[in-house]
Amino acid sequence: MKKPIFMNALIMIVLVAALPVFSQTQKQEEKPWDWDIKKVKTLVEQVRAGRDLTPQSWPGRAKVAVALSFDFDAETNALRDMDISPGLFSQGEYAARISVPRILALLEKYRIPASFFVPAVTVLLHPEEIKAIVEKRNHEIGMHGWIHERNSLLSEEEERRLMRKSYETLKGATGKAPAGIRTPSWDFSRSTLKLIRELGLIYDSSLMADDRPYELLEDGKPTGIVELPVEWLLDDYPYFGFSRYSSVRPHIKPMDVFEIWASEFEKAYEEGTLFVLTMHPKYIGHRSRIAMLEELVKHIQTHKDVWFATHEDIALYAKKSIED
């Protein structure tokens, strides 16, 4: 009877000995409030806003540029989270099956080009929808990750691999190299701007340092990359996103959102700069919401000297300010 007791005790000793030993003398991770200002500046100045790239006027002497964009995520959010629920997949299927055709019909009705930021996995899952987007009114397909992964959770090498893989997938599917990127979840790592430059992209649309187009700085140095800034106020997710199992359960009337977006447009028009909307087919494509978007388009078109354009065309025009 004593032998099992002895063996159990021996096993416990071995296991305890294998555990890491922590002492009060070990150096603890430095806390943010202990950082000196040099380190703080180094961190915050990795990626900053440079000069304003708003031209004196947009093409055709337009006063304001309007960029409608749609992040066509489809099933990738659920796939990224390894939530393989048919219920969640059906929401992504709705985006492809119903919403994208509705959006394309609206854009065609009002003769408006738009930009679609699409994860590469969405491109592979829904080739017919991608083909329809490309064939209609020169709409743009921009990068939006491989499977809607968060860049800040990846190593630099893993982020590089997925960005290159996404770039080649979009290029192969559309016959055209993508000109720009909107990072999934607007998530920017310490390596993202470096990798954008490696790919030869001309613009990003993920950051929030201005309302106007601006040049990105990397460690204080101009990069030549145009930023077309985004803002949660001008995104449909905060108003229409819904999570069954969390506190994200907004219930906002579409026309209340219309008032917010119309007010934002009016100020952009007054300032003579840029108006960027970020939308998602799985949210904006529902009946009452696509009707609201149509009302917004009609409202914008009552104004003179408005240039509706893709992100690529806006970035190319703004980039002239850098090159001149």
PLM-predicted stretches and their roles:
Residues A9-P20:
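Bacterial N-terminal signal peptides
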Residues P101-L104, E108-S189, T223, P229-S246, ...:
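Metal-dependent polysaccharide deacetylase catalytic core of the NodB/CE4 family, i.e.
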Residues W33-R137, I147, E259, H299:
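Active-site beta->alpha N-cap acidic-glycine motif
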Residues K109, Y203, E215, M255-D324:
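C-terminal domain-boundary segment and adjacent tail
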Residues E29-P59, E168-G172, K176-E271:
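Active-site-adjacent pocket scaffolds in enzyme catalytic domains
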Residues V66-L68, I141, W307:
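Residue-level marker for buried hydrophobic side chains located in beta-strands
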Residues M1-I11:
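Bacterial N-terminal signal peptides that target proteins for export
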Residues V21-T25:
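Boundary at the C-terminal end of the N-terminal hydrophobic targeting segment
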